C-alpha cells in the first residue's frame, strides 16, 4: 500500500504541572508533571497510545456540548469559554509536539490473551450498545469456527474504529469553531497535523483543505480493510506488532520484515497497541496524496447532503491502496457485501463523557 506517514507517535518525557484541566468533566485527572513552553505551558503525560490527546478531545467535546445549553448565565458562558480555550490550546500544543515512534515488543502467537467476555455482543443488534472497550492487543480468536472468528474480530475492531472516528469528529468540531472565530493558531496546528503545512496554500485554500481532510472514515471501509490486510486478525504482523492495515515503513527496526520483500529496507509498520494502528491508518487515508480522489469524493457526498456517506460509494477510490488496484477494490466491495458490514455504518459508541 501507499504510506509515507511519519512513524506512530509517542509522548515526550517533558511534563508539567496542570491543575484541574480535566476536573469537572471526569472523575480522574491525567498524571501531571512540570515544564514550560514558549507559547504556553504544555501538557506532556507519558501515556502510551496518546491517551492524553484522547482525553483532551473528549474534554473539548464535553465543553462544547455544555456551552450549547440555552439557559447558561453569562458568567457560566465566560467560564466555559475560558476552559474551552485552555483545553484547545493544550490540544494544539500536543499536536505540535515532536514525537517519535513508540518501541514495540514483539509478541508471540503462543501467548495471545483470551477473548474478553465483555466484548461478546451482537454487533448488528442496534438495541445493544457497542461497549466502550478498547483492547490493546488482538486476543486468541476461535480457531475452529470461521464465522465465529469473523464475529469476534468485528466485536474487537468496531469499538476501536468508532473511537478514532469520534476523535476525528472532535477535531472537525474544534476546526469549525476556529473557522467561525478566526482562530488562526488552531487552524495552523491542524494544518500541520493533517499534512498541509508543506503546501503553498492561501488561508482560504487551507481552510477548504482542512474541511476535506478532517472527516471520519466510513466504518464498513475500515472494517473491510482491517479484515483483508490482517486476515481477520490472524496474520503474524497483527499478532506480533499490532499491525492491522498492512502499512509499510522503510526502517526494519520499526516494523516486522516480511518473509518476501522486494526492498531490503521494507517492513510492515508495527504499533504499541491496536488503536495506534487504527489512528495511523485513518491519518494515512486523510492525508496521503494517493487518496486525494477518495477525500474529494467523500467531501462531495457530504456537501450533497449525504450525511452518512456509504463506504461502497468510496471503495472505488481506494484502488491505490494495494498493487492489485481494481482487484483490490473488488475484494473490498465483496468483503463489505458478503459480511454485511454496511449494516454497521450507523453504529455509534454510547456517550461515555470524558473517559
What residue ranges belong to the model's regions?
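Catalytic cores of secreted/periplasmic lytic hydrolases that degrade extracellular macromolecules
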Residues: 2-224, 228-355
Amino acid at each position: 500500500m501507499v504510506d509515507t506517514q511519519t512513524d506512530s507517535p509517542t509522548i515526550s518525557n517533558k511534563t508539567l504541572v496542570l491543575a484541574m484541566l480535566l476536573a469537572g468533566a471526569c472523575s480522574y485527572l491525567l498524571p501531571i508533571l512540570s515544564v514550560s513552553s514558549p507559547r504556553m505551558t504544555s501538557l506532556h503525560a507519558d501515556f502510551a497510545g496518546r491517551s492524553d490527546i484522547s482525553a483532551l478531545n473528549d474534554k473539548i467535546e464535553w465543553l462544547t456540548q455544555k456551552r450549547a445549553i440555552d439557559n447558561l448565565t453569562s458568567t457560566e458562558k465566560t467560564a466555559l469559554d475560558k476552559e474551552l480555550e485552555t483545553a484547545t490550546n493544550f490540544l494544539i500544543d500536543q499536536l505540535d509536539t515532536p514525537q517519535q515512534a513508540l518501541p514495540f515488543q514483539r509478541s508471540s502467537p503462543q501467548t495471545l490473551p483470551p477473548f474478553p467476555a465483555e466484548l461478546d455482543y451482537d454487533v448488528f443488534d442496534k438495541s445493544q450498545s457497542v461497549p466502550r472497550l478498547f483492547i490493546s492487543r488482538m486476543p486468541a480468536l476461535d480457531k475452529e469456527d470461521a464465522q465465529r472468528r469473523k464475529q469476534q474480530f468485528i466485536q474487537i475492531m468496531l469499538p476501536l474504529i468508532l473511537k478514532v472516528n469520534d476523535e476525528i469528529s472532535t477535531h472537525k468540531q474544534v476546526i469549525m469553531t476556529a473557522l467561525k472565530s478566526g482562530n488562526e493558531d488552531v487552524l495552523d496546528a491542524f494544518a500541520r497535523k493533517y499534512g498541509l503545512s508543506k503546501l503553498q496554500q492561501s488561508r482560504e485554500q487551507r481552510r477548504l483543505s482542512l474541511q476535506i481532510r478532517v472527516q471520519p472514515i466510513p466504518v464498513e471501509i475500515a472494517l473491510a480493510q482491517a479484515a483483508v490486510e490482517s486476515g481477520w486478525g490472524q496474520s503474524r504482523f497483527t499478532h506480533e506488532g499490532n499491525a492491522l492495515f498492512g502499512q509499510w515503513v522503510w526502517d526494519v527496526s520499526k516494523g516486522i520484515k516480511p518473509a518476501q520483500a522486494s526492498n531490503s529496507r521494507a517492513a510492515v509498520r508495527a504499533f504499541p497497541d491496536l488503536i495506534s494502528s487504527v489512528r495511523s491508518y485513518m491519518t494515512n487515508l486523510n492525508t496521503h496524496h494517493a487518496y486525494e480522489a477518495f477525500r474529494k469524493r467523500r467531501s462531495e457526498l457530504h456537501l450533497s447532503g449525504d450525511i452518512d456517506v456509504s463506504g461502497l460509494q468510496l471503495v472505488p477510490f481506494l484502488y491505490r491502496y494495494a498493487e492489485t488496484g481494481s482487484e483490490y477494490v473488488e475484494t473490498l466491495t465483496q468483503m463489505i457485501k458478503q459480511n454485511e458490514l454496511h449494516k454497521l455504518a450507523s453504529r455509534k459508541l454510547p456517550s461515555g463523557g470524558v473517559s
